[in-house]
Each structure stands twice: as C-alpha cells, then as structure tokens.
UniProtKB/Swiss-Prot annotation:
It comes from the Bacteria. This is tRNA (guanine-N(7)-)-methyltransferase. Pathway: tRNA modification; N(7)-methylguanine-tRNA biosynthesis. The keyword Methyltransferase applies. Belongs to the class I-like SAM-binding methyltransferase superfamily. TrmB family. Its EC number is 2.1.1.33.
Amino acid sequence: MTDQEHSASEENADSVEKHKYMRKIRSFVKREGRMTNRQQTAIDTLWDTMGIDFEEKLIDFNALFGRQAPIVLEIGFGMGKSLIEMAKNAPEKNFIGIEVHGPGVGACLADAGEAGVTNLRVINHDAVEVLDKMIPDNSLAVFQLYFPDPWHKARHHKRRIVQPHFIENMRHKLAIGGVIHMATDWENYAEHMLAVLQASPDFKNTSESDYAPRPEWRPLTKFENRGNNLGHGVWDLLFERIS
C-alpha cells in the first residue's frame, strides 16, 4: 500500500470515527473499487473449487484440500501475486488466504487458475471473524501478515491489527512450533510488532537480532522493490510458538 493510500485510509477513518453507532474497531477500511470482467469471471467460475464461504463452522482442512499437509494462512493478500508464488513454490503445503477486497480476491483467483495452483483457497471476509469462527486451534504451521496498514497517526494505532489480544488469538490457532511471520515497511509499526511479540511468553524470536533477514520464501513485491531502490527499509519478524 502506498503512502497516498495510507493517507486515504486515515482520512476515511476520521470520518468513520464520528459515527457513534460503530460497534467495534476494525483494522481496515474496505475500499471495493471496480471489479474487472476478468476478476468477476474468476469468482463466478472458480469460487466453488477455490473459494470458502464464511460461516460459523470450523474448517476441516484435510477434507477441504483432500490431503493432510501443513497449513499456511495469510491475512490481507492484496491482489494475491505473492501468495500464489509461494503456493506454487511449496506444493507440499496448503495455503489459505483471507482478503476483504473483492477485486483482489478476483485477481488472485484468476491468476491462480491460470497458473494451475491447486493448493490454495481464499476467503473474502473480515480476518478476525474468520479466525474466531472458522480456524481450528493448533491447526496452523505458519501465519503470514505482510505489509498491513500501519495507521500512521497515533490516535489510529488502536486500529493496527497487531495487538496483544490478536497475538494471543494466533497463539491458539498455531500449532506448537508454528511460526508467525510479519513484514512491514513502516519502522514505527515494526517496533510495535516487535514489542507486542516480545511481551508474549508463548513466542520466541527465531532471529538472533530483533529483526530477521527476508526469508527466501517471501517474494519481493513491486512496491518493496521500489522502496528498496529509494533506500526505504523493510522489517521481517519471525516468532515461533513455544507454549
């Protein structure tokens, strides 16, 4: 997400916060945009095989994929290019992607279908509700959160998805030995992520320093490449569930 998009998110949030009827804090602003014909066609033709409808029922991953394999779950996959590349490069794993942006879901399905990816399923819904209602405890091998909205302004920090209660929820969803992998290009958010993870006695940092080098399995995005060329930093965090 660009700085301009981040600013737009914050402006939208300022407006939303004025409404007293808002029942809960959300970590995202849902901007649907225009669905292209290609994206809509992908949803119409591929949803039955690659899409998962939201329901208050735990997913049976073995039945869903027709096999038993490590589950990698990613929240906020955007247009899905990195997620598809990871799924292609790790056919021995099963991937679940959660995204609230409809056109992004359509783009992901279209690209995954063209690439012949079969070990990927997507959910178009609020990730927090999906985690609470659909993801079994102790079921995930890896949880991925790449470049979430940093909510720059201090008064919006409460909207950041990475909070102590969120990490505690992820502790339940990850199996012992499972890994949380986060990445951000916003240093203040990286420091926030690090502080929240370090405060949990149930996780340990897999890196000898605070932040880890980008692992080879996380593809570079166009945005990240552009930032690297401009000298902008990117911070990866990998923490393992130990209890």
